[in-house]
Amino acid sequence: YLLHWRGSIPLEETVDAMEELVKKGKIRSWGVSNLDTSDMKELFSVPNGDNCQVDQVLYHLGSRGIEYDLMPWLEEHQIPIMAYCPLAQAGSLQRSLLKNKEVQKIAKARGITPMQVLLAFVFRKDQVIAIPRSGRTEHVLQNWAVKDVVLTDEEYAALDRAFPAPEHKTYLDIV
């Protein structure tokens, strides 16, 4: 079960409610969505806050703000990241990512689609789980095939140059 937004209820009350649901067998575990580093630190300061199992955040090649401090903090605390919109949703941003010469070059060299390059990028860290949306069986199978794609250091470096991670704290992107 996920707390999707911070809201007006204190985190301590939310954690108590989640833990009660676990205790009653209504849910197996719980996590959060769209909580940034300061929110996660506050969450971990309340009793049982460290029982959080995941932080679901927007993350893709064109939205790398979490890499500055949230991703390292979550990694340090062994909390997986569930990347939503790992393919940058439909629209102009996704089109620009797919048409990027480095993305195209990697896709061509590997015999995969540019979309698969975008998805493979988010798996750079073992702690990242991705939940790409797909409405066609063909795309589901292409997404599944990415489990066998491991980009090289050189490929990651090329993508880093094309779409650099921020060098300072940025607001958490949300959809």
What positions do the PLM features span?
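Beta/alpha (TIM)-barrel catalytic core signal, keyed to glycine-rich beta->alpha loops juxtaposed to Asp/Glu
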Residues: 3-175
